[in-house]
């Protein structure tokens, strides 16, 4: 594995606010992608009381080559999860929350109804909190993402993750064009919802392939793109091809804005929910 360049060195997670956030998460039996996916930004985010909550359990039914989340046979759904989530958000006094999940291909709806219940419970308990969801593709199960779009989260994020050529290696159980279709249909079903998608770089993709993904996302009317460095979690995961320089990320940001995205986040440490509240405010200002 490559040694990390200086620009990817994040501060170790410490501090009183960090520990308070951790305690609230544990008290309400919540999982976070910050912990499960070993996010490098956990220290910065949790010290701001920003946490990305992961619903539907902590075990994924897929084994994507880039992801550090545990895979296997998941537990049954927790019926108290939506209420526990809403209470934790209120206790953390979050103005903006990001909710993601593992893939649950074992469920008839892929877990879509649990997303909807979480949205409804948050609006009941802490109505001022804006809601951003980051969903899987639900294995193209009929009516799944459509029902969530109708529930009207403020932001609907679904990550494209990588370029089409690398899907068989990186996301073998997903389909590039289904992800584009999902994003396009969410916008058609509920035009007031902001749509968002993320792309990892450093897996062997070319600049031309990245620009094509940008064009495809704009054709699907996606408002916001995030571009970040792939970091290989363990030696068994997809091999890192290279570290993309900060200057290249700035170049991609410039190009993405020129293609019509309302907001672009592009840097080595950019992740889907990194600075999500600030970026949501930027999105609102663009409308």
Swiss-Prot record:
A Pfam family the protein falls into: LIAS_N
Record's InterPro entries? Aldolase_TIM (IPR013785), Elp3/MiaA/NifB-like_rSAM (IPR006638), LIAS_N (IPR031691), Lipoyl_synth (IPR003698), rSAM (IPR007197)
Q: Which positions does UniProt annotate for [4Fe-4S] cluster 1 binding?
A: 34, 39, 45, 273
GO CC annotation terms, alphabetical: cytoplasm
- Cystine pairings recorded for this chain: none
Reactions that this protein is recorded to catalyse = [[Fe-S] cluster scaffold protein carrying a second [4Fe-4S](2+) cluster] + N(6)-octanoyl-L-lysyl-[protein] + 2 oxidized [2Fe-2S]-[ferredoxin] + 2 S-adenosyl-L-methionine + 4 H(+) = [[Fe-S] cluster scaffold protein] + N(6)-[(R)-dihydrolipoyl]-L-lysyl-[protein] + 4 Fe(3+) + 2 hydrogen sulfide + 2 5'-deoxyadenosine + 2 L-methionine + 2 reduced [2Fe-2S]-[ferredoxin]
Which residues does the UniProt record annotate as the domain Radical SAM core?
A: 46-262
Supply the alphabetized keyword list. 4Fe-4S, Cytoplasm, Iron, Iron-sulfur, Metal-binding, S-adenosyl-L-methionine, Transferase
Q: Where in the cell is it found?
A: Cytoplasm
Q: In which pathway does it act?
A: Protein modification; protein lipoylation via endogenous pathway; protein N(6)-(lipoyl)lysine from octanoyl-[acyl-carrier-protein]: step 2/2
Single GO MF annotation: 4 iron, 4 sulfur cluster binding
Question: Does the keyword section mention Flavoprotein?
Answer: no
| SMART domains assigned | Elp3
Q: Which cofactor does it need?
A: [4Fe-4S] cluster
Q: What positions does the entry give for [4Fe-4S] cluster 2 binding?
A: 60, 64, 67
Q: What is its EC number?
A: 2.8.1.8
How is the cofactor bound, in the record's words? Answer: Binds 2 [4Fe-4S] clusters per subunit. One cluster is coordinated with 3 cysteines and an exchangeable S-adenosyl-L-methionine.
Q: Which family does it belong to?
A: Belongs to the radical SAM superfamily. Lipoyl synthase family.
HAMAP family according to UniProt: Lipoyl_synth (MF_00206)
- Which protein is depicted? Lipoyl synthase
């Amino acid at each position: 594995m490559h040694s990390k360049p200086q620009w990817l060195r994040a501060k170790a997670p410490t501090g009183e606010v960090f520990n308070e956030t951790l305690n609230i998460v544990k008290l309400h039996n919540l999982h976070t992608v910050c912990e499960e996916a070993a996010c490098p930004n956990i220290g910065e985010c949790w010290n701001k009381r920003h946490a990305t909550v992961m619903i539907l359990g902590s075990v994924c039914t897929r084994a994507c080559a880039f992801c550090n989340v545990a895979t296997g046979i998941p537990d049954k759904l927790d019926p108290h999860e939506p209420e526990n989530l809403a209470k934790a958000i209120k206790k953390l006094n979050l103005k903006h929350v990001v909710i993601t999940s593992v893939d649950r291909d074992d469920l008839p709806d892929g877990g879509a109804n649990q997303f909807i219940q979480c949205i409804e419970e948050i609006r009941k308990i802490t109505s001022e909190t804006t809601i951003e969801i980051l969903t899987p593709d639900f294995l193209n199960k009929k009516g799944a993402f459509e029902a969530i779009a109708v529930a009207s989260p403020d932001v609907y994020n679904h990550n494209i993750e990588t370029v089409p050529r690398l899907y068989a290696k990186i996301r073998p159980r997903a389909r590039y064009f289904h992800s584009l279709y999902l994003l396009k249909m969410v916008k058609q079903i509920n035009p007031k919802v902001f749509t968002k998608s993320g792309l990892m770089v450093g897996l062997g993709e070319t600049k031309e392939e990245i620009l094509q993904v940008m064009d495809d996302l704009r054709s699907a009317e996606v408002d916001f793109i995030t571009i970040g460095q792939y970091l290989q979690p363990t030696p068994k995961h997809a091999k890192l091809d290279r570290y993309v320089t900060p200057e290249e990320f700035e170049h991609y940001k410039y190009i993405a804005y020129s293609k019509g995205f309302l907001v672009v986040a592009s840097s080595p440490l950019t992740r889907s929910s990194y600075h999500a509240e600030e970026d949501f405010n930027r999105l609102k200002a663009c409308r």
